Amino acid sequence: MTETSPTPVLDTAQARVLGCLIEKEATTPDAYPLTVNAAQVAANQKTAREPVLNLQTGVVHHALRQLENLGLVRQQFCSRAERYEHRLGSVLDLTRQQVALIGLLLRGPQTLGELYARSERLARFADTDDVRHHLDRLIQRGLAAQLPRASGQREDRYAHLLSGELDVEALQAATARAAQGARSGSDTSELEARVQSLEATVADMQDALAALQARLNAAGA
């Protein structure tokens, strides 16, 4: 697949697993490529995910194999376990910043401020205008889209198109449910995104420690 190739259409599990591989490559390099179990844990994280999923091991493994068939994932064998890494950047000819944005959008629709705050550990962006520049490039290639503002929304939101055409009404309804009871305003949105980023950092550190402990146990066996 290249810039002129058809975009693959992913189901919910495939999209979530691919997004996890993209994020964990940057945030927990010592535990990457991911095992099936690590991919399952990452896919079922509840922070800043829409929708929140509870995928079983077999579903995650099947999603990884299908992504491998699409060329978006490559399997590696090390430490006596299957491990998987993504190939999104090379397959679709994307920059690091564009891969990071796709990885974040695979969590669910987000605003520029949320993308900028959550991208801190994935890729370097100068500011939200820089984020917008890379998003515009993805939009031009049919990989992302800007969503119409729903009633009461103050900011534009963006979504990926790796799962085909968007059901805008369903996305807006899901966004409204997720935002119910939260304070409105861009400053609050960005602050919440930074808090969620810190929570994700703690989770990633726990993942890395668990991976290190597993390797130490294997070495001592």
Curated annotation (Swiss-Prot):
Pfam families: DUF480. InterPro entries: DUF480, WH-like_DNA-bd_sf, WH_DNA-bd_sf. Disulfide bonds: none annotated. It comes from the Bacteria. Belongs to the UPF0502 family. PANTHER family: UPF0502 PROTEIN YCEH (PTHR38768:SF1). This is UPF0502 protein XOO0245.
